């Protein structure tokens, strides 16, 4: 029997904020995780066909800010640069709109949801694994299932959308062991 083809869709902003919150009470959680190792872990013995990493670049105003702001900007740029170098990961950037203290992400959810449905329509995978707590993906999941695809959800405790969880075939809670620090970020 052929192995199922798996596509992993990572909403990094959602993941990062959850990991950051967990890290406040348990320093062993890593925010700058390796998305490819996460995807491989989630795919298991199945064939990992696609790893999509959806994110936004850090705001440029951080460069002119405090030393801590500059450090955060540089860490994020280095982190995304390392991810972009991995040919097994597709990185897609959304936009930040608004001013300092009132920034909003735009187009991350849209890109991820569109890719999930379009790739299902093209029969590029058998199983989609969504890594997010965001209920905005419910419509994308429902439309993906119209193409007879299975949907798995990796969610974070405490803030997972019940609406999203209810339409997924399999739900798993994120575990510390799923997130390994990205190599090359020593000193950060």
Where are these regions (language model features)?
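Domain-level signal for Mg2+-assisted phosphodiester chemistry and nucleotide/NA-binding surfaces
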Residues: 1-104, 150
